[in-house]
Amino acid sequence: MASSSVPPATVSAATTGPGPGFGFASKTKKKHFVQQEVKVFRAADPLVGVFLWGVAHSINELSQVPPPVMLLPDDFKASSKIKVNNHLFHRENLPSHFKFKEYCPQVFRNLRDRFGIDDQDYLVSLTRNPPSESEGSDGRFLICYDRTLVIKEVSSEDIADMHSNLSNYHQYIVKCHGNTLLPQFLGMYRVSVDNEDSYMLVMRNMFSHRLPVHRKYDLKGSLVSREASDKEKVKELPTLKGMDFLNKNQKVYIGEDEKKIFLEKLKRDVEFLVQLKIMDYSLLLGIHDIIRGSEPEEEGPVREDESEVDGDCSLTGPPALVGSYGTSPEGIGGYIHSHRPLGPGEFESFIDVHAIRSAEGAPQKEVYFMGLIDILTQYDAKKKAAHAAKTVKHGAGAEISTVHPEQYAKRFLDFITNIFA
């Protein structure tokens, strides 16, 4: 961790509102010089460093303003921006020039609240220690130090799709009181370093922050080309698919009440996705083996990023943030330390919101983590063309993934209903 005095920097801050298309027209813009003492995160990756700095700056800005009584249409078109130009800023801390943009800050603030996540906990979980790289199917995938949040690098098209559906998503979360299998979207950002834009989505981790997953499946319902590759299968924790699930005779052993609640929630969520003409989503299934998880593990080597960080390492924005982390300085997962110690296979349902324990008498003592992922693909001209091409290749009756949203939903629900014992 480094504490450095930041030399005078030109900082341009802007609050923006709606504009044509996906762009935004600036409503207000001010430029001023600041001299400030800032604790700066020593991130090896400039992109990550700027992202974490920007989140800290954003949360600090939001903390100065009370939440609105109700969200207005303009809140779904708004954004906040900051531009930093500082030729003297040391490269090992942050780049000398960068821009940071948060989309719809009040909307995501409201969503975090509805998902039971305090802004200060959100900040600490993201920034107290460096996030670690995790294996993702496409794009960059980071997981925060307490494993409660994931940061996914997405395309500008994904951001545009997310932006266009955000109002519907928010209304749905309000209607279901946050009780959903959909991804819990908590923040949407753009980071500009070296004249390159990167887009980040922050979500709650579908898996546990403390119970390791021993097997995982990405289930769509389609069986064509839905088997993990040989290259994937040799990984320590491969992402298996529908054919693998069937070939291994895998089943999910939960009680009838839990199964009923889960399927009702799933059907409601899928109906919502059909209304938005969304398809190609999956059920992510993670399985924690309680017996295996209770066995002592050999200590592995200390990760390089852990060995380089002391306990007080934090990235903060303006000085008001330094050392002011509210009443739960351990972040989202920190609540766990104020309660009784958890035994093998035990979890706190308000943190591990997607966890379901196997039923009494089940052949395997397991904890299952199940939620919907990849919900940004809409049925557009590209999907129609892909559907036509695959129909020619595999035949009209083949279980291909690119079908109409209604067909996709029916096939998906039929498949998921049958994964239970």
Swiss-Prot record:
It catalyses: a 1,2-diacyl-sn-glycero-3-phospho-(1D-myo-inositol-5-phosphate) + ATP = a 1,2-diacyl-sn-glycero-3-phospho-(1D-myo-inositol-4,5-bisphosphate) + ADP + H(+); 1,2-dihexadecanoyl-sn-glycero-3-phospho-(1D-myo-inositol-5-phosphate) + ATP = 1,2-dihexadecanoyl-sn-glycero-3-phospho-(1D-myo-inositol-4,5-bisphosphate) + ADP + H(+); 1,2-dihexadecanoyl-sn-glycero-3-phospho-(1D-myo-inositol-5-phosphate) + GTP = 1,2-dihexadecanoyl-sn-glycero-3-phospho-(1D-myo-inositol-4,5-bisphosphate) + GDP + H(+). It holds the Pfam family PIP5K. The keyword Lipid metabolism applies. One of its GO terms (biological process) is negative regulation of insulin receptor signaling pathway. The keyword NAD does not apply. Residues 43-420 form the PIPK domain. Phosphorylated, phosphorylation is induced by EGF. Residues 69-75 are annotated as: Required for interaction with PIP5K1A. The modification N-acetylalanine is found at residue 2. It comes from the Eukaryota. Its EC number is 2.7.1.149. Transmembrane segments: none annotated. GO terms for molecular function: 1-phosphatidylinositol-4-phosphate 5-kinase activity; 1-phosphatidylinositol-5-phosphate 4-kinase activity; ATP binding. GO terms for cellular component: endoplasmic reticulum; plasma membrane. It is found in: Endoplasmic reticulum; Cytoplasm. The modification Phosphoserine is found at residues 26, 349. InterPro entries: PInositol-4-P-4/5-kinase_C_sf (IPR027483), PInositol-4-P-4/5-kinase_core (IPR002498), PInositol-4-P-5-kinase_N (IPR027484), PInositol-4/5-P-5/4-kinase (IPR023610). Keywords: Acetylation, ATP-binding, Cytoplasm, Endoplasmic reticulum, Kinase, Lipid metabolism, Nucleotide-binding, Phosphoprotein, Transferase. Phosphatidylinositol 5-phosphate 4-kinase with low enzymatic activity. May be a GTP sensor, has higher GTP-dependent kinase activity than ATP-dependent kinase activity. PIP4Ks negatively regulate insulin signaling through a catalytic-independent mechanism. They interact with PIP5Ks and suppress PIP5K-mediated PtdIns(4,5)P2 synthesis and insulin-dependent conversion to PtdIns(3,4,5)P3. Interacts with PIP5K1A; the interaction inhibits PIP5K1A kinase activity. This is Phosphatidylinositol 5-phosphate 4-kinase type-2 gamma.
